[in-house]
Amino acid sequence: MANSTFSGPIRSEDTFKTVSKAASTGTITEIITLGDGPVTLGDEDSTLTNATHSGRLIVVPAITANRTITLPSPVAGSHFKFIYGGAAEETENLIFDTGADANYFIGGVVHADSNADNVTIYADGNSNSKLTLTDFGGMEINIMAKDSTNWLIW
């Protein structure tokens, strides 16, 4: 793949995609799509893909039961930003799952604590592959692949 240098603005009438290429196989993997509008998930368990979801705002709707959002295999630089698009506090749980226990979260989550115990939410950096939001009423969660194994979360 050639390198290009641009000295002025770059324009796309659709989107920009960043990709990675496996040195051994030549396989191209889409990492982030820039320029597309938000993606609204349905009221069901969801499995994300880099090509469809990375680099785009992901809106989680009001949910009627516990729901799991499963991340794709991590590709360094892929980024998922989630916000809540419902109108009221949920009584169900929303679970973010890395898809494998060997792929864990690193980082912490800032949150509004409704029961005043002021507990900090953070991953231990060696085993937390799931994050569960319980009775949430609003959220903004960012998850980015640190490398091909782990996810940064904030």
Where in the sequence are the language-model features?
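Contiguous ligand/interfacial binding patches
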Residues: 114-129
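Short solvent-exposed loop/turn micro-motifs enriched in small/polar/acidic residues
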Residues: 3, 124, 134-136
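Low-complexity acidic/polar repeat-biased segments
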Residues: 128-154
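Exposed extracellular interaction/assembly regions and N-terminal maturation sites
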Residues: 9-11, 15-118, 145-154
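Residues that act as N-cap/strand-start positions at coil-to-secondary-structure junctions
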Residues: 4, 63-65, 137
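Solvent-exposed loop and beta-edge segments used for protein-protein assembly and interaction
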Residues: 6, 74-76, 135-137
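Long, leucine- and charge-enriched amphipathic alpha-helices
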Residues: 2-3, 11
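Short aromatic-glycine motifs in intrinsically disordered, low-complexity regions
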Residues: 1, 67-70, 131
